[in-house]
Amino acid sequence: RFRCPWQTVCTTRRWAKAPWWNVEYLIYEEEDAKKSIDCNNIKNDIDFLGADLLITLGVDLKSESEVKLCNELDIDLIVLENKKTVRERSYVYINPNQKGCQYRYKNLSLSALTFKLMQAIAIYYNLKSINKYLDLILIGAHWAKVPLKGENGVIIKEGKKFLINTNNYGLRAVMELNNIVELDDNSIVKIIELITPTGSTVGMVNNARIILELLITNDKDRAEQISKYLYNLKKPEE
């Protein structure tokens, strides 16, 4: 199982392609949905990339040992989750359901929560046009099946406007493959079904990487190639 909707990873990956940011990503490969990031993950998968900042989506650190290791390696931490917890963290921990958080909207999807972080960073760095990523945020929120009220409802409503006119080559290829010209809930479900990893754990990880490439590529032909591959992969055998 993947605890984080990879649409959220795609959004973060695409949005963070600023000239001064060198962004890498790691798809979480564990079947155990309760597993957290441990010291081995940090040493072998994260420090290996020379990371200065680790942003985790839906996966927390296992213990204070991991926090200490990140401090020793000069890796700053931002963890995004949305679940009830009373444990205090010594790092940036964004969770509307943590004890003491006064944020009004407690049922934000992880995608919506990521978008809130994007908004805050965009304001700080005076970055423009982050709303164009609402197409991906919409897909993640719809996949999570969150209540369509509050900020989730606003994001889904606005996201539909960006999705139908998306400039994302991957989403556009998927929509054209499914002959989607008008957007409704059934159309969104079709998109989600095509770009949701399936199969064994290994197969899911490999497909998730391919899907990630689909959603961040700037090559129209490559997007069409991947979308057709995914379509044939999921097409029932006759």
Language-model features: where?
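Short intrinsically disordered, low-complexity coil segments enriched in acidic
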Residues: 1-3, 97-98
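Short alpha-helices
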Residues: 87-143, 150
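Hydrophobic helix-and-loop "lid/oligomerization" segment in the mid-to-C-terminal part
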Residues: 2-54, 122-238
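Hydrophobic, small-residue-rich alpha-helical packing segments that form membrane-like cores
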Residues: 14-111
